[in-house]
């Protein structure tokens, strides 16, 4: 490919609204262009990278016997009503009506659609197991699209689904996908961490996330030297033992005025107590009405755990208006004492040992102190609701957990019979009895992989692409292509090298400085410079990851160039510059 013919509009500066290094560099390097919040066009360089990521994923899917299909983006609402997820999935689902007033969605995922297809085809146990995948655009109406390709409204994803007659077969497929995802990470060259994960709106019995490590990642990951690792949404907390309750004698319940204080710390300072002696009351609205969740004042509530325990993905925190309208009190003073019996009260286990604690007074400007469980209010259900943080004891060994950040690229689920039972997906076994399919699903973010690689592999000059997905392997920079000898050698090298490598020939009439800066910005692994040293019979080779140049003589032909190129590309390792701990 000749640079003079390549549509790669590079920029000196990134747009002011680009919030991560990856999207700044991808825009500056001419890989993508933003069309709207969370919506991007892939230009030729970006599409080359995207296609290479796709190819790696396809090869790993083929290696485990997963067959490729292509499903429609538009899905009828009826399928989602069958599964019960039309309302449960949440506001991220893009819904619309056609001209006949029929409801449809732009698919955020395809469990329902594929189940509706195979339930009419897979009837006998002899047809199992079966694994199918597609690579296609997905759509989610993110409330705040951000981080470039990482949190977009339209994105490219590989989603696979497996169908089984027994759990042993699902376990094998799950392990196959687990290993395949590890190989994808390794082939791309990413540093990564696999963690136990929350199943969220997808549902199921077991789930793992594959995260590319990045300080700018959205995912918070907790891990321990013993091998335990989980997302903060999933990480269990080693609760205080019921055998160590607060030994204080019960005090009288007292409603005290707390003028002008709302936050936990303000209440603690005013009442001269610690945040641990305050219980926060968080009100949520769900399918079955209001739910009050109680958590200690020094802790944060894990909404994912709350949704999972209550089996309600529609739970959202009640608004100021809803609290005032239904309970007649501002949100900062809501509490469990005297709460309406119709409101379900759930609490984190760490609240159970407390005695004489502080809660909202159900009256503006007031709090209760001296509150005791059982005497002053009752809890309907106890759960682990705490958002685990760095330093919390590991649930497996008790040692303090460590924390890192990551970008979720892969997510695998054991769905079990959640969809097959609801959508009448049954097979007949060898005894003629009917059973629901046992399913798994396995997602991989193709487009966000681009951003994850750039987040890990870049420097102050630009991107540093791994060889496996680089838009080109080599760029030949002709310093002054109008000079006959430079042009001749550059063209000869281009014709020779493109037989084995993907080569970009920079034949533009531009200054050497512009060409060198563009080569670094675009991040091509190896640069060959044909310039002023040609008068001495020399050309210069430089890896994107290194500062030093390698001079190679071409006085006796190009054999030494071929040998040096092969040697340099073998040692090329952008992971060494990955900006992660």
Curated annotation (Swiss-Prot):
UniProt source species: Kosmotoga olearia (strain ATCC BAA-1733 / DSM 21960 / TBF 19.5.1)
Where is this protein localized, as stated in its record? Answer: Cytoplasm
**EC nos:** 6.1.1.15
The domain-related comment in the record is: Consists of three domains: the N-terminal catalytic domain, the editing domain and the C-terminal anticodon-binding domain.
PROSITE patterns listed in its UniProt record: AA_TRNA_LIGASE_II
Name used for this protein in its record: Proline--tRNA ligase
Q: Which reaction does it catalyse?
A: tRNA(Pro) + L-proline + ATP = L-prolyl-tRNA(Pro) + AMP + diphosphate
GO annotation, biological process: prolyl-tRNA aminoacylation
Oligomeric state and interaction partners are given as: Homodimer.
Which PANTHER family does the record associate with it? MITOCHONDRIAL RIBOSOME PROTEIN L39/PROLYL-TRNA LIGASE FAMILY MEMBER (PTHR42753), PROLINE--TRNA LIGASE (PTHR42753:SF2)
The terms under GO molecular function for this entry are: aminoacyl-tRNA deacylase activity; ATP binding; proline-tRNA ligase activity
Which keywords label this protein?
Aminoacyl-tRNA synthetase, ATP-binding, Cytoplasm, Ligase, Nucleotide-binding, Protein biosynthesis
């Amino acid at each position: 490919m000749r640079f003079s013919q390549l549509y790669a509009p590079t920029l000196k500066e990134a747009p002011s609204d680009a919030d991560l290094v990856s999207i700044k560099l991808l825009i500056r390097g001419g890989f993508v262009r933003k069309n709207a919040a969370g919506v991007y066009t892939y230009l030729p360089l970006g599409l080359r990278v995207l296609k290479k990521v796709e190819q790696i994923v396809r090869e790993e899917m083929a290696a485990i016997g997963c067959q490729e299909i292509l499903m429609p983006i538009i899905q009828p609402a009826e399928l989602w009503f069958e599964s019960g997820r039309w309302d449960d999935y949440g506001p991220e689902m893009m819904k619309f009506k056609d001209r006949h007033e029929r409801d449809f969605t732009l698919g955020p995922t395809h469990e329902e659609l594929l189940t509706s297809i195979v339930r009419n085809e897979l009837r006998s146990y002899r047809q199992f197991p079966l694994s199918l995948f597609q690579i296609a655009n997905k759509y989610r109406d993110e409330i705040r699209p951000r981080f470039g390709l990482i949190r977009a409204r339209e994105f490219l994803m590989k989603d696979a689904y497996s169908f089984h007659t027994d759990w042993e077969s699902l376990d094998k497929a799950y392990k196959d996908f687990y290993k395949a995802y590890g190989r994808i990470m390794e082939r791309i060259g990413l540093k990564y961490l696999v963690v136990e994960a929350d199943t969220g709106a997808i549902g199921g019995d077991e789930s793992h996330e594959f995260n590319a490590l990045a300080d700018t990642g959205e995912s918070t990951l907790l891990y321990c030297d013993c091998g335990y690792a989980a997302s903060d949404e999933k990480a269990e907390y080693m609760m205080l033992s019921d055998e160590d309750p607060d030994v204080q004698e019960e005090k009288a319940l007292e409603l005290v005025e707390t003028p002008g204080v709302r936050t936990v710390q303000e209440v603690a300072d005013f009442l001269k107590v610690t945040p641990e002696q305050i219980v926060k009351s968080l009100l949520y609205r769900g399918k079955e009405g209001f739910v009050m969740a109680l958590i200690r004042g020094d802790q944060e509530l894990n909404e994912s755990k709350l949704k999972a325990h209550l089996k309600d993905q529609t739970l959202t925190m009640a608004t100021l208006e809803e609290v005032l309208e239904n309970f007649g009190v501002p949100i900062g003073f809501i509490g469990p004492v005297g709460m309406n019996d119709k409101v379900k009260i759930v609490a984190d286990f760490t609240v159970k040992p407390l005695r004489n604690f502080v809660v909202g007074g159900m009256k503006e400007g007031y709090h209760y102190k001296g509150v005791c469980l059982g005497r002053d209010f009752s809890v309907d259900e106890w759960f682990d609701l705490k958002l685990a943080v760095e330093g919390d004891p590991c649930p497996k060994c008790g040692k303090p957990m460590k924390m890192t950040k990551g970008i979720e690229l892969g997510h695998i689920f054991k769905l079990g019979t959640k969809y097959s039972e609801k959508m009448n997906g049954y097979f007949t076994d060898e005894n003629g009895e009917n059973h629901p399919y046992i399913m798994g699903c396995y997602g991989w973010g193709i487009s966000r992989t681009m951003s994850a690689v750039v987040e890990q592999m870049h420097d102050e000059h630009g991107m540093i692409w791994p060889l496996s997905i680089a838009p080109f392997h080599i760029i030949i920079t002709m310093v002054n292509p109008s000079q006959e000898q430079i042009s001749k050698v550059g063209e000869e090298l281009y014709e020779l090298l493109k037989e084995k490598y993907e080569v970009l020939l920079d034949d533009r009439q531009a200054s050497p400085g512009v060409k060198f800066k563009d080569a670094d910005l675009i991040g091509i692994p190896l640069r060959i410079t044909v310039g002023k040293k040609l008068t001495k019979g020399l050309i210069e080779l430089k890896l994107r990851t290194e500062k030093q140049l390698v001079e190679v003589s071409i006085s006796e032909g190009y054999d030494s160039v071929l040998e040096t190129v092969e040697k340099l590309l073998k040692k090329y390792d952008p992971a060494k510059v990955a900006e992660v701990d």
